């Protein structure tokens, strides 16, 4: 297998969690949603699912680097590696890659590279480069395998994947939390307040009890059945205010909404991702008419800072809800 193929594949996976020039830390979320909006899937699978599958095959020895290179979109790292080949600039490559290129530089210095084809593939024609020069890069693939899972990226990819079509849940969570806040404040119709409180108590408790998709979906369903038009209006209003907050376009009326504090805390954690992906996120927002579509949008926006949203919003709302209920029972 060629040295250039190894370098391209390792550079691709090594730069996976590096900030992108245009999309920052949201680059792979951009790839997922762009693929969805343009329907440009390859083999009916999301780009992230294909990247994970390719890495697994490499790790297991079922795939060689020459084939892996053809399965990955290595155009950006090819440009960076070619820049190093032409002028020694390794900007935009991970630290492991930069060390490997420095080692290759000792065997194929810039003076030997000048005058050849000005891209990384010309490196294959240079003799005397040891075959073990990429041995220290093997850990890159293993580290990559942890990244999509730990960052929530794999989950979002599955939600948008046309074959898997996993169910999202963060829109439901947003609606449930903001409505729980209204219940705690006594700002729901009096005739439904007790049933709404009971619906929450059945599925959600303090200390993260019920902080999962099935419990949130159950409460959301009960809110729809009990709150009806009031809950439907609440969902629309809160979602509008959230997007106005992320766009820095709030009105005084928005800020007077009884849930504004919760919406703002929620939105602070989504705002960077929204800003990075604004055009695509707005397209999903405008055309999102079903709960499935809205859940997918919110899963996209909440992916990066999900744990912070739980700390800033979920825990605070749940704790306030139960503190309020305990006071009522004591009275």
From Swiss-Prot:
Q: What is this protein called?
A: Uncharacterized 37.2 kDa protein
Q: Which domain of life is it from?
A: Viruses
Spell out the InterPro entries in the cross-references. Answer: AcMNPV_AC11 (IPR009815)
